[in-house]
């Protein structure tokens, strides 16, 4: 486990444009403490969907959640949650950031998402050769992560709708992306027994994209 030392002697600055909680804390940048909300969310249930405009702080808050569920106690020193959290468990965290990726074609999108799954398969076990679809691979990963760690998985998705918005001028591509995402996100419902927490962000209301049942 890597432990970073927060440099309290370093001049503080406003972290404009920085969306990574770890960098803000390590650099001792100005941070508005929202960790009490993290504790409340974790305690009160799943899943959560945050639909807000861009530049609203969604990515930073998701990064905050990621650090918490990865058990990064060192990054929360002096913050509200450090006074009440005692366990700091290291959950298996699946983090999907759709702010980045190649969404120019269906093939490129599948490949981009597949590479992300590849990285998790290296951590939680080899790919099941019988799992042909992205959804099947994701389903297997949630199960194997639970079995390997003894803890249910945490799934964090940033800008869930970005692929659809990028393809907005090509209806055929939108339909193809919607089909991929609908089956992929459908895994979250089917594998609920292996999931501890889900938090999804985006800018589009779910009833406008038809990918969640």
Language model segments and positions:
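Phosphate-binding site recognition
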Residues: 1-213
């Amino acid at each position: 486990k890597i432990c970073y030392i927060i440099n309290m002697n370093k001049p503080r600055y406003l972290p404009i444009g920085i969306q990574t909680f770890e960098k803000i804390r390590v650099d001792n940048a100005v941070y508005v403490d929202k960790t009490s909300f993290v504790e409340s969310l974790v305690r009160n249930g799943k899943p959560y969907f945050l639909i807000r405009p861009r530049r609203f702080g969604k990515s930073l808050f998701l990064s905050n959640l990621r650090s918490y569920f990865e058990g990064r106690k060192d990054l929360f020193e002096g913050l509200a949650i450090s006074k009440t959290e005692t366990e700091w468990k290291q959950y298996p965290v699946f983090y999907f950031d759709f702010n980045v990726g190649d969404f120019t074609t269906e093939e490129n999108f599948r490949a981009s998402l597949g590479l992300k799954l590849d990285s998790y398969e290296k951590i939680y076990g080899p790919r099941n050769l019988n799992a042909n679809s992205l959804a099947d691979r994701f389903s297997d990963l949630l199960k194997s992560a639970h079995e390997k760690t003894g803890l249910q998985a945490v799934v964090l998705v940033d800008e869930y709708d970005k692929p659809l918005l990028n393809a907005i001028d090509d209806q055929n591509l939108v339909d193809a992306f919607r089909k991929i995402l609908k089956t992929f996100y459908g895994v979250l419902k089917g594998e609920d027994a292996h999931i501890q927490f889900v938090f999804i962000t985006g800018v589009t209301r779910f009833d406008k994209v038809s990918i969640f049942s």
